[in-house]
Amino acid sequence: SIKDPNTFFGSHTVNHMILTNEQTNVVKDEISKSKEIIEKETGRNILHFCYPNGNYNEGIKKIVARSYKSACTTRAGFISKGSDIYSLNRIGINEEMVTDWRGNFSKYVFMFSLFIESVRR
């Protein structure tokens, strides 16, 4: 539910444009309007951004930094103390990573999946 305090939302642009292919004014508009729309719909302050398709550059990072506390890429990996908060790696989560052989959620399967991911990296 949108009102659930344990549900978090981030911004991702309005039209899923590849920002590195767009003019600066379009980039600013896509980033700011996405934030505005989600904040209006949820009644929450949107603090985090994800670059569409993972495409960004230093200029886009600076635009994002004006309105958000962090941003993630599509690069797989973990975050460490020295990670750039505007180009964070992430781990994709799918159903196989969180369910046991019966199809039920299992925190142990999830923890094991994260361990396997950390070893692979």
Q: Where in the sequence are the language-model features?
A:
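C-terminal active-site subregion of NodB/CE4 polysaccharide deacetylases
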Residues: D4-N6, V14-M17, N21-R121
